[in-house]
Amino acid sequence: MVLVGAYAGLRWGEAAGLTRAGIDVLRSRITITSTAVEVRGHVTLGNEPKTSRSKRTVPVARSVMRRLEEHLANFVGPESDALVFTAPRGGPLARSLFSRRVWQPAVIRAGIPHITFHGLRHSFVAILVAAGCNVREVSEWAGHNSVAFTLTRYGGLFEDGSDAAVDRLDALLGDGSKDPDNVLQLHTRNLR
């Protein structure tokens, strides 16, 4: 479950409600069409995702998909609606149970203070940016309601492109270091 949070950017409810039908092993994709919602310890399935853009298909690294494929083979029923992640005795996984019995003890053992499951989404976005994905792709795959939100929240992770622009301009115009007398003539029209 941690892998789909960190490497596919799924929200808790999306991961808890993920079914076998949402996993395309051959294309290495996860499709989100519904979520699980917990109210006072009771989990309901088949709920609408957070926003209309939350319904999405996310590319997943093949190394992560191989681990997910092993999980499917060993722990998930063959039915298309079989939940990928379940409670210890089967059935939907409650966030409160997972947090108390699995997540918090693991975080403490790892020595990572105050990280939440949702924090894994932030890691996912950072990984996409580091991999060179553009803001539109990041926004779409994270299920954000707009590119503007992605830029507001994560804009500092994206390179602004200025260094690349300088390199392209130097390639076009020259950097002036070889012959200072070699000046590109700019012609203008008389605007009178």
Which role does the model predict for each range below?
Residues 8, 58, 66, 70-96, ...:
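Short, basic (Lys/Arg/His-rich) helix/loop patches that form interaction surfaces
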Residues 18-21, 101, 123, 152:
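Structural detector for helix-capping/boundary residues
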Residues 5-36, 136:
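Short, charged phosphate-coordinating catalytic segments
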